[in-house]
Curated annotation (Swiss-Prot):
Descriptive protein name: SsrA-binding protein
Subcellular location: Cytoplasm
Any one GO biological process: trans-translation
Keyword Oxidoreductase: no
Organism placement in taxonomy: Bacteria, Pseudomonadati, Pseudomonadota, Betaproteobacteria, Burkholderiales
Gene: smpB
Gene Ontology MF annotations: RNA binding
Function summary: Required for rescue of stalled ribosomes mediated by trans-translation. Binds to transfer-messenger RNA (tmRNA), required for stable association of tmRNA with ribosomes. tmRNA and SmpB together mimic tRNA shape, replacing the anticodon stem-loop with SmpB. tmRNA is encoded by the ssrA gene; the 2 termini fold to resemble tRNA(Ala) and it encodes a 'tag peptide', a short internal open reading frame. During trans-translation Ala-aminoacylated tmRNA acts like a tRNA, entering the A-site of stalled ribosomes, displacing the stalled mRNA.
GO cellular component terms, A-Z: cytosol
Length: 148
């Protein structure tokens, strides 16, 4: 079940491969995500010291958050993947034009996972073309549905 989807990622990038990564979260972040208080539209993944980090995602703390901690809504969060997957991703990202973007947050076995995509940025004309195709598919479906 998806918690948050990054629909903008599919508009701005053409996603070629998907990977599921674990997230290192604090307790208040998990509670806030359960309440639907997360945003990953501006998020991206960086590689530091052969580790992946999620930057730019915003998880708003609940008003009932503990008083003895100071929640940082946009802190850098570590992504957990197998070392073979990380080395494969590093090799691909070092190629020209590839980037890693968060696609969604979801639960798997009671834990929050982040689906990241290996993507290439779309040019403006590619975005327009994708939009035209989507509109035509919608129109086609509408025409097929309508009686007469």
């Amino acid at each position: 079940m998806s918690i948050i989807d990054n629909r903008k990622a599919f508009y701005d990038y053409s996603v070629e491969e998907r990977y599921e990564a674990g997230l290192v979260l604090e307790g208040w972040e998990v509670k806030a995500l359960r309440a639907g208080r997360g945003q990953i539209k501006e998020g991206y993944v960086v590689i530091k010291n052969n580790e992946l980090f999620l930057i730019g995602t915003h998880i708003s703390p609940l008003p009932e958050a503990s008083t003895h901690i100071n929640p940082d809504p946009v802190r850098t969060r570590k992504l957990l993947l197998h070392s073979e997957e990380i080395s494969k991703l590093i090799g691909k990202v070092e190629q020209r034009g590839y980037t890693l973007v968060p696609l969604n947050f979801h639960y798997k076995g009671g834990r929050v996972k982040c689906e990241i995509g290996l993507a290439k940025g779309k040019k403006q004309h590619d975005k327009r073309e994708t939009e035209k195709k989507r509109d035509w598919e919608r129109e086609k479906a509408r025409l097929m549905r309508s009686p007469g």
